[in-house]
Regions:
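N-terminal Rossmann-like NAD(P)+-binding domain of SDR-like oxidoreductases, especially those catalyzing
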Residues: 1-147
Length: 147
C-alpha cells in the first residue's frame, strides 16, 4: 500500500516541486494551499494523476483530512519580505495557528512531520556567511518580525 504525504503550501514553488518528487517516488499526495501566495498553475500538470489530490484549505483554521497520513511536509507560509509587509497577519497566523493545526493532524495520524523555514528567521545578518553559532539580528517590530 502506498504511503500518503500531506504537503502544505503545495501550490508554492517548493511545495509544488515536492509534489512532483514524491509522486515520482510512488507516494500518494494530498496537497493543501489557501492560494494567497501559491498558484494552481504550479500543480496543473498533476490534475490527471490519480495519486494526487488538491484541497483549497486555509490551515490557520481547524481542518480535517479523511485519509490516513503517513508524512507531513509543512511549507505553508508567505516567505518573502514583500509578503510580510503586504499580508503580515496572514504570515503570522500561518506560522502559529497553521503550524498548531498541522501538528494536530500529525498527532491524530501518528505522522512524521517536517516543518520548513527560511533564513528570514535570522533577520538582517551582521556577518556573512553566518556560522552555526549565529543567533541572528531580528527586529521584532521590523518587516521580518511576523515571520
Amino acid at each position: 500500500m502506498k504511503k500518503t504525504v500531506l504537503i502544505t503550501g503545495a501550490a508554492g514553488f517548493i511545495g509544488s516541486h515536492l509534489c512532483d518528487y514524491f509522486l515520482s517516488k510512488n507516494y500518494k499526495i494530498i496537497g493543501v494551499d489557501n492560494l494567497i501566495t501559491g498558484n494552481l498553475k504550479n500543480l496543473s500538470h498533476l490534475n490527471s494523476n490519480m495519486d494526487f489530490q488538491f484541497k483549497k484549505i486555509d490551515i490557520t483554521h481547524d481542518f480535517h483530512i479523511e485519509n490516513s497520513i503517513d508524512y507531513i511536509l509543512h511549507f505553508a507560509s508567505p516567505a518573502s519580505p514583500i509578503d510580510y509587509l503586504k499580508i503580515p497577519l496572514e504570515t503570522l497566523r500561518a506560522g502559529s495557528l497553521g503550524t498548531e493545526n498541522v501538528l494536530k493532524i500529525a498527532l491524530k495520524n501518528n505522522a512524521r512531520i517536517l516543518i520548513a523555514s527560511t533564513s528570514e528567521v535570522y533577520g538582517d545578518p551582521l556577518v556573512h556567511p553566518q556560522p552555526e553559532e549565529y543567533f541572528g539580528n531580528v527586529d521584532p517590530v521590523g518587516p521580518r518580525g511576523v515571520y
